[in-house]
């Protein structure tokens, strides 16, 4: 007798990109067929996502080296480069969170990975020219945001391949190992800048005017460096990864039924990404000071304006079958859990990516300077500190800790529940933020700030550890609360909003450093964490919680 699924296209052919029969909750199907395909897609997704994070986050390291090379920009202007990459990547995640259902997993991951070739190449080109205007560097930082968008589509895609009981583990592996892109970038870029690995094709070296560093220690002023390799190096991995995505990944037709021909899918992706760039550029133009922008609005207006504009543009500009697909996925905004989980993911991932972006330059400014008063007793922050720690030797450790521990957060949450884990890490983050703020205050008022560096570094490692565990727990909770049709878009949406931490953190910390009160940034973050701790208890842990410890 024919079975219910006998006339369906089999899901067992590795060469068949489109799968029409997908039943991960069916144990027999999962063990015989689904498990192999799901893990193959996962292990291709991870390095692709890693490179996305690397390209997105690399301006945090590049700006430190630009300062060491004497690029003619102020500290505030260098902070804007990191922030621009942050806001662009966050905005790209808004359309990216919907792409899997509109264009298919394999189509989306392939194209968005291949798209990274352009900003990697462009960044390498502009970094060879100290005399180019600031807007040229800002444009490249904006373009690098494509890498930030990849997280939303990657997580949305992987969530569709695995059964609910493995959501925490699978998403933790994809996100945690993908997050290693930040650490990989912070280790690889200082390394490749020390050697002219591309020969004559890679351009000429520049000479350091300040001490720099890499994972093994300091690099003295006067040493030649190839800062352009910070962009060029990623071409070596992006080309083979793009090929691997195309030939090794799959589209699940049970999730993405109407993707059309791959060229049609590519057109949808490109169209939605182009739409998302418009509000990013508009928001940045209104926010950034002259001459790049007009400086009319604050960051706290720019971010919600950017989010609302991106959603409206997508909603109004979509057409045909794409309009119906976008409208259907907008239904997630009617669910109160979408909003609660968005806030909680800002606590975890927003902090992880925000600190990853802001920490290198913050360390350089706080610990690389001897803070001494002038003859009038006014504190000055211009005297170079000869005993300063090498920023590039330490900046990678925090993101490494956060990324490494994230899969553990998902695994533990699968065992004891995601919300209780989130509650614990939120409490830790409140205390650690207050403590690190106090240490920053002490260091920024000291002629020997390096004496405070070990405690500063240790407390930030604790913060990164907590964010990593929390990243895994919050994504596990989303996988349990929402059904299979909504879980992917919600994962993408929450990651999009949390990614604005990559814009907010560098600006907030940079502004407070400029004001002479860096501790206030950390105290403000602690207040937000405390509010979200109460939110998590109300929604998921109290006696009559909406959903008990998902």
How would you label these PLM feature ranges?
Residues 133-149, 449-469:
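Hydrophobic core of transmembrane alpha-helices in multi-pass small-molecule transporters
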